[in-house]
Curated annotation (Swiss-Prot):
Coiled coil: none annotated. One of its GO terms (biological process) is natural killer cell mediated cytotoxicity. Signal peptide: none annotated. Keywords: Cell membrane, Cytolysis, Inflammatory response, Lysosome, Membrane, Transmembrane, Transmembrane helix. This is Protein NKG7. Induction: Up-regulated in CD4(+)T-cells in the liver and spleen upon infection with Leishmania donovani. GO terms for cellular component: cytolytic granule; cytolytic granule membrane; plasma membrane. The chain crosses the membrane at residues 9-29, 61-81, 92-112, 133-153. Belongs to the PMP-22/EMP/MP20 family. Pfam families: PMP22_Claudin. The keyword Transport does not apply. It is found in: Cell membrane; Cytolytic granule membrane. Gene3D superfamilies: 1.20.140.150.
Length: 165
């Protein structure tokens, strides 16, 4: 297996794992006050609270990014097995899906970041982004790497020429 394909598979797997962890954990925001500390994520625990629209947008695009990342990694795995892959098409599909995952997670993170920054802070409470939030941005970078490396793997694959058919 060529190095671009194996590195793309590694970066895509890390991107998929980090986006799944970021999506499911509750440490996107941490709030500290004089006598308390609290954290929250994308999934509210109380049924009575009204969820803001930007949270729904972030949830939706994060889920899309996970799905695109899963398809990308699956096609990279299939491209490593010659009997299961179409000649030269696995890395190309993986490239498109990895870039789609990167775009989806970028939209999710940009919406969440812009809406959290525009909220007015309370005087006694300090809020800041936590590790789940930063893991979402890391998954964006990893999906970009996976897309670029998959594109490199696609460009380096040998295609059947007319004479060999």
């Amino acid at each position: 297996m060529e190095p671009c394909r194996s590195l793309a598979l590694f970066a895509g797997s890390l991107g998929l794992t980090s986006s799944l962890i970021a999506l499911t954990t509750d440490f996107w925001i941490v709030a500290t006050g004089p006598h308390f500390s609290a954290h929250s994520g994308l999934w509210p625990t109380s049924q009575e609270t009204q969820v803001a629209g930007y949270i729904h947008v972030t949830q939706s695009f994060c889920i899309l990014a996970v799905l695109w990342g899963l398809v990308s990694v699956s096609f990279l795995i299939l491209s490593c097995i010659p009997a299961l892959s179409a000649p030269g098409r696995g890395p190309l599909v993986s490239t498109v899906m990895a870039f789609s995952a990167a775009l989806s997670i970028l939209v999710a993170m940009a919406v969440y970041t812009s809406m959290r920054w525009s909220q007015t802070p309370f005087s006694q409470v300090q809020t800041f982004f936590s590790w789940s939030f930063y893991l979402g941005w890391v998954s964006f970078i990893l999906f970009l790497f996976a897309g670029c490396l998959s594109l490199g793997a696609h460009c380096r694959t040998r295609r059947a020429e007319y004479e060999t058919l």
